[in-house]
Amino acid sequence: MNIKNSVIFTKKELLYFCIQRFAFGFSYSFMIPIIPLFFNSLGLSTLVIGRVMSLHGVGKALTQMPSGVVSDKIGDKLLLIISYGLLSCMPFSYTFASSKVMACIIYIIQGALLGISAPATFSVLSRSLDENKRGESTGYASAVFTLGGAVGALIGGFIVTKLGNYNFAFYLSSVGIVLSIIFVAIKIKKPETKVRKSNKSKDSQGSSIKDVIKTKKYNKFAPKIILLGAIAFLGDFIYGCIVSIFPFYGQEVLGASAFYTCIIISVYLFVFGVFAPVGGWSSDKIGVKKQLFLSFIVMNSSLFLLSFIRGIIVFTIIIIVYFLGATFLNSALQNSLLKFGDKPEIKSIVFGFVGACESLGYAVSPIVSSFVYELNKRYLFGMLLVSSLIVFITFLILYKKAFSLKLS
């Protein structure tokens, strides 16, 4: 893969998309490793933190489907600016949170706003990528967001664990999101089809669900949509478990420091960022189906080992291997999902559905993982292994039907 001839340098729209995603990922991720610690500092128990993070995910899931319709109506760029604008207020709001209840409400609203931004983000990406290098394009898009997130999470964790200053991290997050909004407003183009579609808005809106049902019935896209939804669910389920519970697991089970747990979350994002383009490129070369299968094998093997290993050095090596497997799985997922961008009559519904599944995984994960953690702290990664195996079995059942037809 020649970097100089890479699609990110040959397609301007994709470059601008990647810049804004890096900026947003960097800014937003100041909060990711410190939110559980922030809630804990307010006196919330692990179980309550899990429930709050679950409601955050519920809010994110509930807003995605309707936001897909809104994105079609007002344009993805405008919806992205509005959602980012509201999100920029969230980190700043934590500095005024005078009670546990207020902090929890802010976090739940934050989840709903993330859900609003998701369909618009997918829509902008689907019209910014190179059709001939779809996997590579989505790989770079994922990479810049998670690379920015890795750096942001590391800085946020350092500020809190070493300086003990939550407010400073929240201020930086808000300012960074505002800068992302400015870039989106200046550099991201409006969708070209907006005016043409508005002439038949009633017809398109009224037939969207009907078109999806018809597509499922006659073109057999349902297995692919269900499979993509299941994989998206798994990805955010495991990510949500690690973000919400690992800060406690690392200290209480592995005997590591709080800063180590922040580093692991940052490494999670860093691995995604560095290897997502490779994963996207390889999914173009070997095919999505084969890459999904190999990724599941790596993930399941790693989770099996992580379920009983307690030594920090070996644990760190194996969890990085797991991160690699998850990265390649996500790259294949994004490659397959964004092919629905060629189906304008159903793309927003499909993006919204898969995004809602992803958010549902994040919603369920904290409450499930906190329950398992309270039951037995050592069961955490065993539970993640069982979850991954269930989705892997779903893949084995559906993959023939899911990949039997082409979208374009």
Question: At which residue positions do the language-model features occur?
Answer:
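Symmetry-related core transmembrane helices of the 12-TM Major Facilitator Superfamily/SLC fold
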Residues: F168-A185, F381-L396
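Residue-level signature of mid-helix packing/kink "hotspots" within the transmembrane helices
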Residues: G57-M65, G149-A150, L269-P277, S359-A363
